[in-house]
């Protein structure tokens, strides 16, 4: 029984994987870290963790493994894994969460795709039909766009409006602008590829984007966890780090 952990910038996502399916999945902010772990239906035999949240979170995960007296392996990017090839100039510099999401995407969809992870940052990654990662984009996430305007201007609020095609108030204009900007990046990248490949959407803000996206798409819960599960099942060696 493997406890898969996706330690993102804003939240910790976890899933208990038994080798064939999920026993549970959940997500919390880091203040409630111990509460989530306390809700596990049974003790895991090991932990596989993907961490992009920094050293403090890394230490908390290590402390958890020590408390449970189980092994801990860190998922890191590599040149190839689980049928996916990494074409980054320096493969090890690709974010581990992006790499896990690409593996998850390849597991769930065998054709070419664009993989969108909408979190604190939004990443838009190209995966071809042979499982080769061809590169991608990084832009501020929806919430980060909103707070950047609030923190760096004198008069704009930290908006709590709604998406509108033609906004007529400031809050709606900010919310709609952030969503339009992200949709535009996704749709423009797809247009440059010149085909009708599927867009796979995941992450905390994915549900805000999906209703307005004008290309074929599929909304997936916890794509990073899906990649970790695939890695744990299919790869015989996990490099400790």
Model-derived regions, located:
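Glycine-rich phosphate-binding/hydrolytic loop that grips phosphoryl groups
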Residues: 154, 179, 217-241
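Active-site rim beta-loop-alpha module in soluble metabolic enzymes
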Residues: 139-193
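N-terminal glycine/serine-rich phosphate-binding loop of ATP-dependent small-molecule kinases
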Residues: 1-81
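Small-residue (GG/TT-enriched) beta-loop-alpha framework at ligand/catalytic clefts
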Residues: 100-114, 134, 139-156
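Gly/Thr-rich phosphate-binding beta-strand-loop-beta motif of the actin/hexokinase/Hsp70
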Residues: 1-23, 105, 111-133, 149, ...
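Conserved phosphate-binding/catalytic loops in two-lobed NTP-binding clefts
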Residues: 69-83, 214-229
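Conserved phosphate-binding catalytic cores of ATP/NTP-utilizing and phosphoryl-transfer enzymes
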Residues: 83-113, 227-238
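Glycine-rich phosphate-binding loops at beta-strand->alpha-helix junctions
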Residues: 11, 50-57, 176, 196-213
